[in-house]
């Protein structure tokens, strides 16, 4: 049973790394969008704090 769970986790890790390498060019856009959203959130917090 433990071996089956280990094999399942290993297969999941391999599929995740495969998807990551396949969508590597989209990672930069995703990271840029996250940074933009984070800066917008910080600006909103400052705006609420100033009022």
From Swiss-Prot:
Signal peptide: 1-19
PTM per Swiss-Prot/TrEMBL: 24 proteolytic products are found in saliva.
Molecular function GO labels: metal ion binding; molecular adaptor activity
A GO cellular component entry from the record: mitochondrion
Site (Not sulfated): 43, 47, 49
Phenotype for residue 32 to T: 3-fold reduction in candidacidal activity of His3-(20-43)-peptide
GO process annotations (BP): biomineral tissue development; defense response to bacterium; defense response to fungus; innate immune response; killing of cells of another organism; positive regulation of fibroblast proliferation; positive regulation of wound healing
Alphabetically ordered keywords of this record: Antibiotic, Antimicrobial, Biomineralization, Cleavage on pair of basic residues, Fungicide, Immunity, Innate immunity, Metal-binding, Mitochondrion, Secreted, Signal, Zinc
Region (Implicated in the interaction with HSPA8): 24-27
Motif HExxH motif, residue range(s) on this chain: 34-38
More details: The recommended nomenclature of salivary peptides follows published guidelines. In agreement with the authors, it has been decided to indicate the boundaries of the peptides according to the positions within the precursor, and not in the mature protein, as has formerly been proposed.
Family named by the database record: Belongs to the histatin/statherin family.
Record protein name field: Histatin-3
Species the sequence originates in: Homo sapiens
């Amino acid at each position: 049973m433990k071996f089956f769970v280990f094999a399942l986790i290993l297969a999941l890790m391999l599929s995740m790394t495969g998807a990551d390498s396949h969508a590597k060019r989209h990672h930069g856009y995703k990271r840029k969008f996250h940074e933009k959203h984070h800066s917008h959130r910080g600006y909103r917090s400052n705006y609420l704090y100033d009022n």
